[in-house]
């Protein structure tokens, strides 16, 4: 008699095995993508001007002849995952897809820095210590593996800090693409402060689109100290937990998900002070995820839940609408409005 688990049919068991193997080896998804970026393959295909044959690709890569078959295997797998298209005519060739177009260095929208930053062993390697982290009372995952909090680690490691800032800037460019169609966010404003605005990628887009709007990029002093502004763009260094420059509006893009509810309340209260000084009643605009497992498509939910686990390792979290609402009320805001922004991000406007 065939063995079974709890009376399961063999077909169910084998389906479960396939699911397990898919996730056991899922690291190859990330590492093969990292390989393509490190080998500059998207740019090679882009510069070729047409689908590139395997023989031309390995010639440009200058790989040993013994590894040509391995290059083909990796390209076949990446194509299966949607990063390249295989064209079969006289010789197997590879073309870019929308996904790999986002990895072409030098293009307006390039996420290659994000691939390099997140998949650097410094960051990705920390996830081998999830078990140890779970039993530590107060430490974040990176506190366990790096010996300090993530932000302290960035301050002490300029090279990785640059990589992180480049990654955040590359991601901001995609968000900015969506913001161009959100004129209503900036209507009637004379000033806005981008809290945690990094090197100013988002603020520059806002300034170009709304030249009469005064933009302030507010970030840690070491991030902005060597940056120069323009007519309607200025950089200010400081601590968002202490005070935030006054403005008609505050922008928090990918900020609150980094922090605990307690810390978010501190930030939101400082934001409220910044937009209500001098009798004004401005607003706070948040760009972040809103988890909705009932309404979202499965793939969107998976991304949001994946990011929630990722943020948990920083002591942050992704939130559903009820969790957001609770924060806003406790911080003293009266009402809010949520609008879809991109495939998995929302634009939240809150008013004191």
From Swiss-Prot:
Keywords per UniProt: Methyltransferase, S-adenosyl-L-methionine, Transferase
Stored Gene3D superfamilies: Vaccinia Virus protein VP39, Winged helix-like DNA-binding domain superfamily/Winged helix DNA-binding domain
Pathway info: Phytoalexin biosynthesis; medicarpin biosynthesis
Enzyme nomenclature, EC number: 2.1.1.150
Residues binding S-adenosyl-L-methionine, per UniProt: 196, 219, 239-240, 253
Keyword hit for Nucleus: no
Residues annotated to bind substrate: 118-127
InterPro entries: COMT-like, O_MeTrfase_dom, Plant_O-MeTrfase_dimerisation, SAM-dependent_MTases_sf, WH-like_DNA-bd_sf, WH_DNA-bd_sf
MF terms in GO: isoflavone 7-O-methyltransferase activity; protein dimerization activity
Keyword Cytoplasm in record: no
Active site feature: 257
Cystine connections: none
Catalytic activity, as annotated: a 7-hydroxyisoflavone + S-adenosyl-L-methionine = a 7-methoxyisoflavone + S-adenosyl-L-homocysteine + H(+)
Biological process per Gene Ontology, one example term: methylation
Top-level taxon in the UniProt lineage: Eukaryota
Quaternary structure and partners: Homodimer.
General function of this protein: Transfers a methyl group to 7-hydroxyls of the isoflavones daidzein, genistein and 6,7,4'-trihydroxyisoflavone. Can also methylate (+)6a-hydroxymaackiain with lower efficiency.
Family the UniProt entry places it in: Belongs to the class I-like SAM-binding methyltransferase superfamily. Cation-independent O-methyltransferase family. COMT subfamily.
Protein name: Isoflavone-7-O-methyltransferase 6
Species of the source: Medicago sativa
